[in-house]
């Protein structure tokens, strides 16, 4: 199995890694959560930016991201989970990729979550920019209705790998 190293954390070897989310809606809630999580024994922190009430001001969110990263002494994963994949907010494809471009160019973090079924051109450009900025990509797909056949799951994981994901993730329901 291929390993992926983010700061001092190596995924794919040793013990399973623990990721703890930040899901505050306001700056104050997020700072409070980040200060607490900085003291917790976990490996990676995931900021679910789709919960953040001011996420649509992309530049300000990128600046705030720097503040959050500074509080944490752990690798930071940034995730905007779209509504169709179980997230909090609806966002057009164009705005999704614009947001990620701004965060990659202006923010401070280590990993970026990209959804497999977003438009291929935008996904490719986002992955390319992320890798230029030395960020790792977690590519994901969520099925809240069922567990697809094994062949479908393998096909999706292979597609993620072909697109350049560093880490491939599938989440399904029974």
Question: What do these predicted ranges mean?
Answer:
Residues 2-3, 15-132, 145-147:
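Active-site beta->alpha loop and helix N-cap motifs at the rims of alpha/beta catalytic domains
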Residues 7-13:
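Short boundary motifs at domain starts and secondary-structure transition points
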Residues 111, 116-174:
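Catalytic alpha/beta core domains of metabolic enzymes, predominantly
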């Amino acid at each position: 199995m291929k390993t992926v190293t983010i700061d001092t954390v190596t995924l794919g070897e040793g013990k399973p890694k623990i990721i703890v989310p930040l899901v505050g809606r306001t700056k104050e809630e997020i700072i409070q959560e980040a200060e607490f999580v900085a003291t917790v024994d976990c490996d990676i922190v995931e900021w679910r930016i789709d919960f953040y009430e001011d996420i649509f001001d992309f530049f300000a969110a990128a600046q705030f991201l720097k503040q959050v990263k500074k509080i944490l002494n752990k690798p930071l994963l940034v995730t905007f989970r779209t509504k169709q994949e179980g997230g909090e907010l609806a966002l057009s494809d164009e705005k999704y990729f614009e947001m990620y471009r701004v965060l990659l160019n202006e923010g401070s973090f280590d990993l970026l979550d990209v959804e497999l079924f977003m438009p291929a051109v935008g996904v490719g450009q986002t992955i390319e920019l992320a890798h230029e900025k030395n960020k790792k990509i977690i590519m994901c797909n969520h099925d809240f209705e069922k567990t697809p056949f094994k062949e479908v799951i393998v096909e999706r994981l292979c597609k993620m790998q072909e697109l350049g994901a560093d880490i491939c993730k599938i989440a399904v329901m029974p």
